[in-house]
Amino acid sequence: MTNITHLLGEIKDIDETLKVHKLSKQDYEEILKILKRPPNLIELGIFAAMWSEHCSYKSSKKYLNGFPTKAPWVVQGPGENAGIIDIGENLCAVFKIESHNHPSFIEPHAGAATGVGGIMRDIFTMGARPVASLNSIRFGDISDNGTLGKKHRYLLRGVVEGIGSYGNCMGVPTIGGEMSFESCYNGNILVNAFCLGLVKKDEIFYGKAEGIGNPVIYVGSKTGRDGLGGAVMSSDSFSSTSKAVRSAVQVGDPFAEKLLLEACLELFKQDLIVGIQDMGAAGLTSSSFEMAGRSGSGMTLYLDKVPMREEGMNPYELMLSESQERMLICAKKGCEQQVLDIFAKWEVDAAIIGEVTKSGIMELFWYGEKCAEIPIAQLSENAPMLDMPLRPVAVQTHKANQLKTSQSAQEIFITLLGSVEVANKRWVYSQYDSSVQSNTITPAGSGDASMIRIKGTNSALSMSVDCNMRYCYLDPKNGAKIAVATSGRNSIVNGAKPLAISDCLNFGSPHNPEVMWAFKEVCQGIKESCKVLNTPVVSGNVSLHNQSDGVDIYPTPSIVSVGLIDDVSKVVSSTFQTQGNMLVLLGEIKAEFGGSLAQKILEGHIYGQIPSIDLTQEFALWNLMLEASDECMLSAAKDIGEGGLAITLAKMALGNGECQPIGCNVHTHLPSQLLFAPSQSCIIVEVAGEHLNTLKQKAKQHKIAFTEIGCVGGDIFCVDEINISLEEMKKLYFESFEKLIAQDL
């Protein structure tokens, strides 16, 4: 038995203790009011974790209010472990995106791996089997020839290995994602992990603890000291000395999680439990307080009953450890042994560590001695909200309607196609198992959205993650609108109707008034776009304090759009299909280069107005595309993105490298620089001749510009003055990124 006298007495140096726990004097005054006495160290640690930015959203919550969260197909919106939408045939999709930025910068492999593990637990804790994963990862100047580039290539390799190793061991396919490189991430990379699962509509479980006397059961890996202070660490800034917090990074074991997953799914088939919650950030503290808080209950925990991996652990460590692969269950009274037997069958630790009470109080005991007593509602539901100061940043109003370069269109094309931003990332996604479970239709690198079929039905789900952080830096509100629209458009081009989004809002320091103004603007942009596009927000995550040595990242709202197609045979390809088919531009190319990839690469900096977006026009384009794909008019489609029309056509020609590329002959009659303009609400479609007039009429009905620009065919890529062989394009597109990564090996 570990002596805990030092944890129960009066805190001697309160100022230093508050500093270590990232609590303010005002926080401490509030704690005194709640407890009506000074806290002991255990209680102070619990308050620090639950009131951290990571757990409480104290700086951001006020701006999230007003997100559209309801629709006839929404079963569960924000507030639970994940969002849920009805996809028909008594099935629901459960999904969420979440950040694991700070841990991944400190220990890239472990940080990324546990990020994947944590988001998977959020999904299967609701009764769903995970069936697909995505990721959005962002690094600094990876092309730098010095130590900075070497460092970020190391970080990239570690993150990719961590994502791949965990997902592959879990048997969950990683089917897509996005990757970006900007100097703003030099001191703070981003690793956002997304997971989607499927569950029957009448078999959903929630994170609640109710029913007086119901037992509270700990299941999963034993608790160690890894991850101590993780929630507080994730709510703090980085500096050049941040390597000292390695101990706050959790250590994952995907094999243990696989056993936990299967044991939980077996448990869900029987009527044995009331609720279940993942032990994520803040570990046993957050799971217990959140479960009881949602139900208005109290709870008693006997911490000496918690399975421990290390000797000499104390209540402070047990409550705040973020050891991975652990869950907390509220079982039905009298069903304890059946629950324990299921986990014993799967060789997963399980122990009864407490019970639900009616007190509304969390009471913690250590070998019969009460060591903490805290009102639950004050921590779980009523954390202090901060009204951080805002300072608007002038959105640039001058138009960037041309690229300041003397390069020809051919030279610009070659530069962009081989750039680290555009070049194919098969070195990355080849490390992910994208075909396990045998449901994948379009894996990473094969389509604008990634798609899986829904077993036992004729339907398929699409999912895509997107955010152009340069746009959000220059114009946060409209940049966020573009992120929502683009993520949904990626599903549209493959034939699926977007139904809902999950967002991961990555920002710098909330103490910087300009950062909080950008946060407010981004939230407003998301609200407006989701309302017009009818894609409610059902889950999400906020990650603040993404800055290092005073340098904030660009505002980066990673948006995942999830869509549904009723007939899997109507999925539209993103690559050229048939020689002789016509190519059509839907939408209008405009001279808008502010924040574009071409501007960044060719001019060395970004400035000016970002591409404009008309959400009503965007929605009309979606409806046109859904009609056309449903009537099987489209052979292929791809939206115009980074690099403009020329790069979009190049990707359609080259595909993912597994099939023979097909050339094209295109004459746009556009000024040459406009071939690289990333205009919004624009899609290239491949159409057989017999469907051309019908599609043209439909475009007219929806008031969408329709321009025939050429045809598919040949072994030359010819787009206006760009004329290049497919072999040369393949070399640039498929080898550039791999060469960059290989230089350190």
Swiss-Prot record:
Which EC main class describes this enzyme?
Answer: ligase
**What is the name of the protein in this document?**
Phosphoribosylformylglycinamidine synthase subunit PurL
Its family? Belongs to the FGAMS family.
Residues holding Mg(2+) 1: E98, N541
Q: Where in the cell is it found?
A: Cytoplasm
The entry's keywords: ATP-binding, Cytoplasm, Ligase, Magnesium, Metal-binding, Nucleotide-binding, Purine biosynthesis
A UniProt-annotated Pfam family: AIRS_C
The record's subunit annotation is: Monomer. Part of the FGAM synthase complex composed of 1 PurL, 1 PurQ and 2 PurS subunits.
**Organism expressing this protein natively:** Helicobacter hepaticus (strain ATCC 51449 / 3B1)
* Record: residues binding ATP: Y57, K96, D503, G540
Q: What is its EC number?
A: 6.3.5.3
Quote the CDD domains the UniProt record gives: PurL_repeat1, PurL_repeat2
Q: Name one GO biological process term.
A: 'de novo' IMP biosynthetic process
Q: Where does Mg(2+) 2 bind?
A: D122, D278
Gene3D superfamilies with a match to the protein in the record: PurM-like C-terminal domain, PurM-like, N-terminal domain
Entry superkingdom: Bacteria
Pathway it works in: Purine metabolism; IMP biosynthesis via de novo pathway; 5-amino-1-(5-phospho-D-ribosyl)imidazole from N(2)-formyl-N(1)-(5-phospho-D-ribosyl)glycinamide: step 1/2
Q: Which GO terms describe its cellular component?
A: cytoplasm
Matching entries from InterPro entries are given as: PRibForGlyAmidine_synth_PurL, PurL_linker, PurM-like_C_dom, PurM-like_C_sf, PurM-like_N, PurM-like_N_sf
Q: What are the recorded GO MF terms, alphabetically? A: ATP binding; magnesium ion binding; phosphoribosylformylglycinamidine synthase activity
